[in-house]
Structure formats: structure tokens, C-alpha cells
């Protein structure tokens, strides 16, 4: 089975998926492989009962429905590949009905909380200037962390106030920037040369001059959230989610938000409508209920 897994991943690497997506697929299939080994079950023996048994195993181990669905999708795609190659007669996962996902929406920052977060970096230090520019761009554009960290100096146009961003499958999109983000970038570019000891084209890098990692950015946003006294669960995508919901709150149409976020599927963007409704209901309740 190990050889088949490697052949499969050699195939899907050609699809220009992100490394994070491929890594997630690999973890899912590896875990399923370990499950089969423990059961002493061969790949060709897998049927819908095996899949149901595996789902129960994941549930017992505390996996959320969303995680289980992703696991099953990964396995289904693997078996689809095996079926196409003639290794399996059919795909056992197609007979399995996916569990419905109860969406637990991530926490969204209020505009006041975003202001607190963005005021966190110390504008008198090179690190603070860099951090401020990164956070302002994240909130101004709603781009993904990987998109932010892959930006080069050639992707920004301060004169016309836009950023050129490359998303999934290297698809390019142009995102406008607000005046705050532009101003922070102008200040940052003055100190960037001093920080760029490795002479690289990436717009942002760590204090050693290397390309910043996702973990490095996560530590930055976590630090300022704690220092700002924000109690909500913060992650590297909180500003992206808040960007989308705040646009909805201020009347932006869902199609425009889809284009700004780089979603290929409108259904993904419409999740933010549910997040907005949840936030809006909570706000109305707090303002209007006498015992809120």
C-alpha cells in the first residue's frame, strides 16, 4: 500500500495543489493505512462497512464532524485513483453517506477589537513596523497567510493602492488596499532594506532575513492578541474572516467578497453570510434585551 500511496501523491502533485492541502491528504490517508494495519485488513478488502468502522473510530477519538468529512473525502479521492488505475473494482466510499457537518463558526473580531490588535505593534522598532504592515495588509485585503508570506516587492503598487496576489493554482488576483495599509507599507519599505540581510525578494521576512513561516506569523498575531486583551480564540485566519464579515456588515455584495477572497466556489463565500447573521443576532440581542 505504501507504493500505491506514493504513486497517488506523485499524481496529485501535478494538480498544483497547495503544500498544506497535500500534507493534509497525506496525513488522512496515512492514518487510514494505520487503521487497516491494526485491523489486519487488506486494501482490496475495504468496503463500506470498513469505512463506517473507521468513522466510528475517528468519532471515539474525538474528531469533529468537519475533520471526519475531510478524512473521508481524502480516502474517497485515493480510492477513485485506484479505481481509475484498475487496482480496485469500485470505490467503497461512494456507498457511504457523509455525516452532516454542524458548522462551528470561528470567532470574528469586532471593528474595535481589530483596532486594538492593529495598534499593538511598536512603531518605534523595526520589528514593530514590519508587524504593523503585515497585520494591516491582512485586514485590508483578506488574503490567506500563505498568500501574504509569498508576496514579493514586485507584487505591490503603492501609487495605485493595490496588491497582486497569487492564490490556488497560481491564479492571480488584484486586491485594492486602503490608505492605512498603504501608509504602513510606505513606512515599512524604508526599514525593509536594513532588515533584508539575505537580499531576497519576499516582501516580509523574519529577523534573520529568511522567508517568514506560517508558524512565525501565527506567533506574531497571537502575541498582539494577548497583549491587546482579546479573549476570543485567535488564529492566523482571524483577520481574513473578520475582513469578510465586516465587508458584509457594511453592505458589500457576496460576489465582490468572493472575488476579493479568491474563492472559486460561491458556496465557500456564503459561509460568511451565516457568520454575519450569527454576529448580527448577538449584537441586536445585547442592544435590545433588558436583561442582556
Swiss-Prot record:
Q: Which SUPFAM superfamilies match?
A: DNA breaking-rejoining enzymes
Q: Which UniProt keywords apply?
A: Cell cycle, Cell division, Chromosome partition, Cytoplasm, DNA integration, DNA recombination, DNA-binding
Q: What is this protein called?
A: Putative tyrosine recombinase CA_C2066
- Ranges for domain Core-binding (CB) come to 1-83
The record's listing under NCBIfam families reads: PRK00283.1, recomb_XerD
Question: What GO MF terms are annotated?
Answer: DNA binding; site-specific recombinase activity
Pfam families annotated for this entry? Phage_int_SAM_1 (PF02899), Phage_integrase (PF00589)
Q: Which residues form the Tyr recombinase domain?
A: 104-286
Main subcellular localisation: cytoplasm
Q: What does this protein do?
A: Site-specific tyrosine recombinase, which acts by catalyzing the cutting and rejoining of the recombining DNA molecules.
Q: Which residues form a coiled coil?
A: none
What's a GO cellular component annotated to this UniProt protein? Answer: cytoplasm
Q: Which InterPro entries match?
A: CB, DNA_brk_join_enz, Integrase-like_cat_sf, Integrase_catalytic, Integrase_recombinase_N, Integrase_SAM-like_N, Recomb_XerD, Tyrosine_recombinase_XerCD
Misc remark for this entry? Answer: Although strongly related to XerD, it lacks the Arg-His residues of the Arg-His-Arg-His (R-H-R-H) sandwich residues that are clustered with it.
Q: Which domain of life is it from?
A: Bacteria
A single Gene Ontology biological process assigned to it is: chromosome segregation
Family according to the record: Belongs to the 'phage' integrase family.
Q: Which CDD domains match?
A: INT_XerDC_C
Q: What residues make up the catalytic site?
A: 169, 240, 263, 272 (o-(3'-phospho-dna)-tyrosine intermediate)
User: Where would you find this protein in the cell?
Assistant: Cytoplasm
Amino acid at each position: 500500500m505504501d507504493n500505491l500511496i506514493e504513486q497517488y501523491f506523485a499524481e496529485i502533485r501535478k494538480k498544483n495543489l497547495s503544500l498544506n492541502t497535500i500534507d493534509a491528504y497525506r496525513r488522512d490517508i496515512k492514518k487510514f493505512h494505520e487503521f487497516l494495519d491494526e485491523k489486519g485488513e487488506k486494501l482490496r478488502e475495504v468496503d463500506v462497512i470498513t469505512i463506517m468502522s473507521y468513522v466510528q473510530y475517528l468519532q471515539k477519538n474525538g474528531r469533529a464532524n468537519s475533520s471526519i468529512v475531510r478524512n473521508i473525502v481524502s480516502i474517497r479521492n485515493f480510492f477513485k485513483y485506484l479505481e481509475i488505475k484498475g487496482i480496485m473494482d469500485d470505490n467503497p466510499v461512494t456507498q457511504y453517506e457523509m455525516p452532516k457537518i454542524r458548522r462551528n463558526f470561528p470567532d470574528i473580531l469586532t471593528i474595535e477589537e481589530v483596532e486594538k490588535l492593529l495598534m499593538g505593534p511598536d512603531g518605534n522598532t523595526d520589528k514593530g513596523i514590519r508587524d504593523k504592515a503585515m497585520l494591516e495588509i491582512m485586514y485590508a485585503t483578506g488574503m490567506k497567510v500563505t498568500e501574504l508570506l509569498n508576496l514579493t516587492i514586485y507584487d505591490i503598487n503603492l501609487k495605485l493602492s493595490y496588491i497582486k496576489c497569487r492564490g490556488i493554482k497560481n491564479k492571480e488576483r488584484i486586491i485594492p488596499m486602503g490608505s492605512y495599509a498603504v501608509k504602513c507599507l510606505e513606512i515599512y519599505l524604508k526599514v525593509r532594506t536594513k532588515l533584508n540581510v539575505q537580499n531576497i525578494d519576499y516582501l516580509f521576512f523574519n529577523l534573520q532575513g529568511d522567508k517568514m513561516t506560517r508558524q512565525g506569523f501565527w506567533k506574531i498575531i497571537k502575541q498582539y492578541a494577548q497583549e491587546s486583551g482579546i479573549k476570543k480564540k485567535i488564529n492566523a485566519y482571524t483577520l481574513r474572516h473578520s475582513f469578510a464579515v465586516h465587508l458584509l456588515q457594511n453592505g458589500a455584495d457576496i460576489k465582490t467578497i468572493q472575488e476579493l477572497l479568491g474563492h472559486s466556489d460561491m458556496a465557500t463565500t456564503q459561509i460568511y453570510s451565516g457568520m454575519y447573521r450569527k454576529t448580527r443576532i448577538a449584537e441586536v440581542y445585547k442592544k435590545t434585551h433588558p436583561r442582556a
